Amino acid sequence: MKKLFKLTFFFSFLMLFVACGDDDLEPTLAQDKDLNTGINNADDLVSVMNSAYDRMTPSGYYGRNQVIMGDVRTDNLYSNVNSGRFTDSDMDYSPNGAGPWSTIYRAIAICNIVIGADIAGLEGDQGKMSHTQGQAHALRALLHFDLLQDYGQHFVNGGGAGALGVPYVKTYKDPANLSPARDTAGANLGDIIGDLQTGISMMNDAYNISTSYMTKMGAYAILARVALYGGAADSSLYATATSAAESVSYTHLTLPTNSSV
């Protein structure tokens, strides 16, 4: 028994030196996707699009903060400081931004990959791929709208449409535009509305998966909200808000039997 124990210990000790080599310690890029070869069909495009949705789910964005921040920034709610979250802040951000800035731009980068794909050369249902790119346009608009609300200066000292907005990024890692300048709030609103209108024209309800994904009706609803919000800086947008709201279909909603409209 003692001899068996010694042999077991010896072989276990020996395995420390022979079990792995230098090659096993080197990381691989097996999970990376080459943008030139990684998107080959409709399903690949959907897979990339899903990663944009995934980047919107952390607690720092739509997983929590984005949903409650409107109330937290007012007198409606306050933090009891028990968790250390949402305590007083001087808003002393670094030049590179803080808060949801980086999270949102990472999601925008994924949308730009989808939008930049040449779907004519991909295999699969062209209608489905057009719908996916439409989702990317609408989602890119929503993401920039969230940035504009957080970082735009259009409500600072009556700055209006000519005040600083945020960089509106439409390409993925463009070498000539890696550090884009901030556009005006008015230009941001124009780009946001343009992306939403493009997305609406490209999406098809036949390809809707669930309410967890962007749809044409969802884009109309966001367009109405964007135009209503932007009307404070450009009153001509109120007409767009009305038109978009009237385009949203409510036929799938069922009112309680004792209610009336």
Regions found by a protein language model. Name each.
Residues 83-151, 183-186, 198-207:
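Conserved, well-structured interaction surfaces
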Residues 217, 222-250:
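Aromatic-residue-lined binding/catalytic grooves and analogous aromatic/hydrophobic interfacial grooves
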